């Protein structure tokens, strides 16, 4: 078991809650392992950029775009907009568990949306080896 997994699991619980450390769950590659689930979200996003030969670190000028996001995408964008407040609250209340909980919730929302792309072509990130500009901006956020 790696130190990153141990830290993530320990940080994902409030200090006033008893820590239930399940070694089997932490080794799983599933939604039951919060660290894996968050890392898998990042891996999926990175794979989209690799497939279209873009660097995830490149800046995007959003002034030239008009966006038409679905309800599901807007919900994810709202969750992303909570990040600064999550950091601030976590710091001011000395509750670091808020950060891994937030990341897990965001990853869960993203994975749900990603899986919708199997049934709805409009929700796919890459279609015919192309990606729309609004999807690029969405993923960069």
Regions flagged by a language model, labelled:
Residues 1-141:
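Non-catalytic interaction-recognition regions
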């Amino acid at each position: 078991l790696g130190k990153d997994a141990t830290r993530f699991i320990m940080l994902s619980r409030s200090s006033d809650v008893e820590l239930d450390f399940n070694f089997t769950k932490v080794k799983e590659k599933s939604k039951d392992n919060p660290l894996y689930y968050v890392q898998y979200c990042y891996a999926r996003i990175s794979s989209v950029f690799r497939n279209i030969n873009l660097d995830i670190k490149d800046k995007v000028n959003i002034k030239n775009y008009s966006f038409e996001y679905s309800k599901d995408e807007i919900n994810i964008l709202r969750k992303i907009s909570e990040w600064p407040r999550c950091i601030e609250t976590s710091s001011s209340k000395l509750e670091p568990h808020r950060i891994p909980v937030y990341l897990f919730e965001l990853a869960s929302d993203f994975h749900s949306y990603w899986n919708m792309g199997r049934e709805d072509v409009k929700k796919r990130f890459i279609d015919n080896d192309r990606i729309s500009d609004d999807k690029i901006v969405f993923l960069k956020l």
